């Protein structure tokens, strides 16, 4: 075919003006040798199309059911540009045949493409794969999920600390009526996945759902799965640390913040009215190696000796020991902070 882009556009506009579908008219099939010589003398180079049969293409789609594409209403797809480069249509089919692809799963915006590609597959003697075209995802507010939304790219999600299984758990259930639950491994997720449960209505993708799932994945993550990364971050060895802090994590990187509470430096927060109470707490602090029982024993003694309870009993201790009002349970943190650092912080010293 020797038409220029401008010539093809003019043809398209004329067809639309006449109420006709903008389908390529196959004028190139009528070119004579003299016509071709004239075009090439003008410096034109040909582009190539795949000639469709004009017959309907029918297949059973795993999501959409029976699909019928009338190839007579389609333009013969361009497979090679005038500059010699190939379009996606033919190379993708060749790759699929060579790789013996059995299933092609993609968005519903490719349904028409599939009709043409099935004819190309058959023309090349390949086996037609099973097709599944799912509805396109929308943003949480119903807008188009564009590639231009960089914060939703897989690379950005990975770089921000999203666990792979958090995203996998969500994607595997989007578009179904099934509840989205955190799943720790692909084998379990695959076992419960059924393409037939995908609906035709567009699914909405909310990044906040990923955040919530990420937290739940971490909360349920066994120590063995977390151990290599904990070692890289310099966390204390053993499951006790992980079991004590994972319930406060949204991202794995949050472990670094908790390690800072343990290792310091921490600037103790001591309210003016709590100085005497913290002095009493220092006197009552169990000496020597602290254990997970030390916190409950210590606070019980303080409750009996000072009459404080609830927030007034616990918050001054947390703020003095960690500099924060919130965080992992103190029964887990106290033995990790250790006796010497606890003494210094109760005295208001940074450390």
Explain the meaning of each model-derived region.
Residues 50, 210, 317:
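Conserved S/T- and glycine-rich ATP-binding loop of Class I adenylate-forming
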Residues 124-268, 322-351:
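Catalytic adenosine-cofactor/nucleotide-binding cores of aminoacyl-tRNA synthetases and other
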């Amino acid at each position: 075919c020797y038409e220029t882009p401008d010539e093809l556009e003019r043809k398209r506009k004329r067809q639309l003006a006449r109420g006709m579908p903008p389908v390529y008219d196959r004028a190139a099939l009528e070119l004579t040798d003299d016509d071709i010589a004239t075009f090439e003398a003008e410096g034109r180079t040909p582009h190539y199309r795949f000639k469709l049969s004009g017959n309907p293409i029918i297949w059973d789609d795993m999501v959409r059911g029976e699909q019928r594409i009338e190839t007579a209403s389609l333009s013969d797809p361009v497979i090679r540009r005038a500059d010699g480069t190939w379009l996606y249509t033919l190379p993708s089919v060749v790759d699929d045949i060579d790789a013996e692809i059995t299933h092609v799963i993609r968005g519903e915006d490719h349904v028409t493409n599939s009709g043409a590609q099935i004819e190309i597959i058959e023309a090349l003697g390949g086996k037609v794969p099973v097709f599944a075209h799912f509805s396109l995802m929308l943003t949480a507010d119903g807008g188009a999920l564009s590639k231009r939304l960089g914060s939703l790219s897989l690379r950005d999600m990975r770089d921000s600390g999203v666990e792979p299984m958090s995203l996998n758990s969500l994607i595997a259930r989007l578009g179904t009526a099934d509840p989205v639950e955190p799943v720790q491994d692909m084998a379990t997720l695959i076992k419960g996945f059924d393409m037939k449960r995908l609906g035709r209505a567009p699914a909405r993708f909310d990044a906040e759902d990923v955040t919530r799932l990420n937290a739940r994945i971490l909360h349920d993550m066994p120590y063995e799965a977390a151990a290599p990364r904990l070692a890289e971050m310099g966390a204390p060895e053993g499951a006790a640390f992980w079991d004590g802090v994972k319930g406060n994590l949204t991202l794995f990187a949050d472990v670094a913040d908790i390690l800072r509470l343990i290792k310091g430096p921490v600037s103790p927060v001591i309210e003016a009215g709590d100085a005497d109470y913290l002095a009493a707490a220092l006197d009552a602090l169990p000496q020597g190696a602290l254990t997970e029982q030390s916190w409950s024993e210590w606070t019980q003694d303080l409750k009996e000796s000072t009459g404080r309870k609830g927030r007034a009993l616990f918050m001054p201790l947390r703020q003095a020991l960690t500099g924060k009002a919130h965080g992992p349970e103190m029964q887990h943190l106290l033995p990790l902070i250790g006796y010497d650092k606890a003494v210094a912080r109760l005295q208001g010293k940074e450390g």
